[in-house]
Amino acid sequence: AYSRDNLGEDALWQFQDTKNINNEVLRSIFINKLNSIYQKDINYHFECLTEINDLPNIDLFDLIRIIGIAYDNALEECVNLRHSGINTVEINSMLYQDAPNKLEFEIKNTCRNQLITNKLHQEGITNKANHEGLGLATVKKIANKYRNVYIAYSSDNGYFTFTISIE
């Protein structure tokens, strides 16, 4: 099969849980982002043990943008750590649905210890050169359009954790 020949058995195994995401557009963003991590040879784990059927009340494009930004930020941080000589980097993510119209996504990645999280969501505040990293400000702007979307993130013991809960 095309996927097996081009991705390898270990990559296909890592994508296995995406089969539980029953929305093709949502599933494709996870496959795309996980493949990007795989291509950069970064350790990762994705878990989606529950069937994702009824999406919560959020525009699908907004949900995909938030998930995409979270993965892009994690991947960029891990690549930057690699360039600075830190080879032990990883990205772990999880998608979970315990009831219809509820959804939780969490991504946790290796990060610099001095990452300051209390200002990252402010527009124009970034840890990146040339102020390229406005992703979390964009995430906050999107989340603020909804009363049922909760965003949380923290940096602890060399890991950055980003969570979105939608009820």
Language-model segments: residues:
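Short beta-to-alpha transition helix within the HATPase_c
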Residues: 18-40
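Conserved glycine-/histidine-rich ATP-lid loop and adjacent helix of the Bergerat-fold HATPase_c
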Residues: 138-150
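Short C-terminal beta-strand
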Residues: 158-167
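Conserved ATP-binding N-box helix of the HATPase_c
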Residues: 60-84, 145
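Heptad-repeat coiled-coil segments of the DHp/HisKA dimerization-phosphoacceptor module
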Residues: 46-50, 97, 111
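Short beta-strand/loop element within the Bergerat-fold HATPase_c
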Residues: 84-100
